[in-house]
Amino acid sequence: MMATPRLRSKKLSEPTIARLPVYQRIAEGRLQRGETKVDSRQIGELAGVTATTVRRDLAGLGSFGTRGAGYDVNVLIERIAEALGHDRLYDVVVVGIGNLGRALVNSSNFLIRGARLVALYDVDPDVVGHEIAGLTVQPLSDPIPPATVGVICTPGSAAQEVADRLVEANIHAILNFAPQVVTVPLGTAVHYVDFSIELQILMYHLNNGTGPLGGGLLHSLGIASTNPLRGS
């Protein structure tokens, strides 16, 4: 089942959207340890932002925190999941089952709650036909089923062709791990993940003694280097 768009009561800023999954991960960690409450100061210390920023971000999800008592961990996880759309079902296809693609689909952290891996594609005859993560890798010449998200894990030289194929399959959200900017029609969202760029940014800060050299989870996840996380 593919997800269908629905309206949100309040539009969240891009920095807030970037921080919310980190808050959710922190809350899930508390839950795993048997804890039921977490406050904005504790979240902020682990995330590397101020308590004020945390409260402002979470205020956009409605009123559910208790002054002096913090947030119920279960409610916090559910509110963030709803805000980010994790309470719906998403079908995901991955194109490029080389080292990176294989590692991603085999990772327990790759798919968010509600996401379902439905198809894998590659052009390598040595890869096509193999079963990975419970799915048989199909040749890229096969039709791509309609899905919510397409993930590109190919070399840069193949990225545009793959993006075109995903768009033709009526996929309007693309996560691109290939080191290549792709052109897509209006209405299609592309998010780029380029480890070499992240490493260059990190090396700059290391060499100049600036930027995200410490702090919390937002820094260690590499998010702070590419997003203005301390802003609103």
Give the location of each predicted region.
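Extreme N-terminal segment that seeds HTH/winged-HTH DNA-binding domains in transcriptional regulators
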Residues: 1-36
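HTH-adjacent hinge/linker in prokaryotic transcriptional regulators
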Residues: 37, 41, 46-92
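Glycine-rich Rossmann-fold phosphate-binding loop(s) that bind the pyrophosphate
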Residues: 97-98
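N-terminal Rossmann-fold NAD(P) dinucleotide-binding loop
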Residues: 101
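Short, solvent-exposed amphipathic alpha-helical segments in soluble enzyme
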Residues: 108-112, 166-169
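NAD(P)-binding Rossmann-fold cofactor-contacting core
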Residues: 111-133
